[in-house]
Amino acid sequence: MNKPVLDIQDRPTVGQWITLSLQHLFAMFGATILVPYLVGLDPSIALLTSGLGTLAFLLITKWQVPAYLGSSFAYIAPIIAAKTAGGPGAAMIGSFLAGLVYGVVALIIKKAGYRWVMKLLPPVVVGPVIIVIGLGLAGTAVGMAMNGPDGKYSLLHFSVALVTLAATIVCSVLARGMLSLIPVLVGIVVGYLYALAVGLVDLSKVAAAKWFEWPDFLIPFADYPVRVTWEIVMLMVPVAIVTLSEHIGHQLVLSKVVGRDLIQKPGLHRSILGDGTATMISALLGGPPKTTYGENIGVLAITRVYSVYVLAGAAVIAIAFGFVGKITALISSIPTPVMGGVSILLFGIIASSGLRMLIDSRVDFGQTRNLVIASVILVIGIGGAVLKISDSFQITGMALSAIVGVLLNLILPGRPQAAENLFEENQSDHVA
């Protein structure tokens, strides 16, 4: 490992602080605003809560884990379903419960260790569920890319999506250095400029917006009644269980980048609690659930600047951006096909990352056990199976596939042993 330019506890100069913090802001910006755009939440609150959530995460992890938290893609479909079932308030209640699950898991890990998590959620379960999450959103991405405001096919709109997609792909594959970490942002900018040129952008709201504007917060009890239903629980909680594996994966990669076992110190329980707390803070203000971002881990790896103060600086800037009305209006003016073009690649990458998890973990599909578990998860999840227990309680698609996968893994014989030490195992194996 190369010597860090700034280690975890090193303070940068003022000039370094601003420049390096902006790099992290740009790395997370595109994905963080895309999620609220897709689910109908306020992008300014997503930015603000990403900053607040990151600061809470850094505090809970004793300023020892250099990570940035942005909007989680895993919750897109559940949030849309929850909003359909009970409005935005129901989605926020579900998000808060998801964060609460993280808190409970963190407490159990502190008392009993983390091996039980690996037994419950091995790659043969998590990989196919991640594939389901990505492919389950494929129709949404294509619809956004192809259709006009009237819901009918539009070649003009599709051309905007294709230009956006092409720019994102070129940046992802050919760009080097910092530019390679912001393909989503580059794609959105290029697509936006093309949409502006062909007349699909209305800048009147940007011109009319104030520079300082209070975000449209969504506060429990004040803006919506707090009512927990089984339907909301079963929409959101299974996703939280699955995204635990994503969190652990990010901590392993981050440990490898900074050359320290973050699983042991400050401890996996602290990082999970930090992630859950960030999600709960976001839910209380009307933002989407949070997760640590691989893009920002990439920034750490390229710059070799691991300072938590740089991440905190990015968080403060994100909070400030949440109150800039012009930025919110500019985000809102992005045409749907621009986001559709980006989403085609992003949702495909989510699905492919599930496949990559299976490959990296060397899951043997020559074993009937693994083949059965993965096959059932994929068909139930992508097929949209629904277990309707009553008129007010049903378990749908992705959540049902995750639950079935966990149960099959526990019931079927031949379950492999979980690793004793995740960090040591992944020092010799390739993890990304």
Curated annotation (Swiss-Prot):
<feature type="transmembrane region" description="Helical">
    <location>
        <begin position="206"/>
        <end position="226"/>
    </location>
</feature>
<feature type="transmembrane region" description="Helical">
    <location>
        <begin position="124"/>
        <end position="144"/>
    </location>
</feature>
<feature type="transmembrane region" description="Helical">
    <location>
        <begin position="89"/>
        <end position="109"/>
    </location>
</feature>
<feature type="transmembrane region" description="Helical">
    <location>
        <begin position="181"/>
        <end position="201"/>
    </location>
</feature>
<comment type="similarity">
    <text>Belongs to the nucleobase:cation symporter-2 (NCS2) (TC 2.A.40) family.</text>
</comment>
<feature type="transmembrane region" description="Helical">
    <location>
        <begin position="370"/>
        <end position="390"/>
    </location>
</feature>
<dbReference type="GO" id="GO:0005886">
    <property type="term" value="C:plasma membrane"/>
</dbReference>
<feature type="transmembrane region" description="Helical">
    <location>
        <begin position="305"/>
        <end position="325"/>
    </location>
</feature>
<keyword id="KW-0812">Transmembrane</keyword>
<feature type="transmembrane region" description="Helical">
    <location>
        <begin position="25"/>
        <end position="45"/>
    </location>
</feature>
<keyword id="KW-1133">Transmembrane helix</keyword>
<keyword id="KW-0813">Transport</keyword>
<dbReference type="Pfam" id="PF00860">
    <property type="entry name" value="Xan_ur_permease"/>
</dbReference>
<dbReference type="GO" id="GO:0042907">
    <property type="term" value="F:xanthine transmembrane transporter activity"/>
</dbReference>
<keyword id="KW-1003">Cell membrane</keyword>
<dbReference type="InterPro" id="IPR006043">
    <property type="entry name" value="NCS2"/>
</dbReference>
<protein>
    <recommendedName>
        <fullName>Uracil permease</fullName>
    </recommendedName>
</protein>
<dbReference type="InterPro" id="IPR006042">
    <property type="entry name" value="Xan_ur_permease"/>
</dbReference>
<comment type="function">
    <text>Transport of uracil in the cell.</text>
</comment>
<feature type="transmembrane region" description="Helical">
    <location>
        <begin position="393"/>
        <end position="413"/>
    </location>
</feature>
<feature type="transmembrane region" description="Helical">
    <location>
        <begin position="330"/>
        <end position="350"/>
    </location>
</feature>
<feature type="transmembrane region" description="Helical">
    <location>
        <begin position="155"/>
        <end position="175"/>
    </location>
</feature>
<keyword id="KW-0472">Membrane</keyword>
<feature type="transmembrane region" description="Helical">
    <location>
        <begin position="65"/>
        <end position="85"/>
    </location>
</feature>
<feature type="transmembrane region" description="Helical">
    <location>
        <begin position="228"/>
        <end position="248"/>
    </location>
</feature>
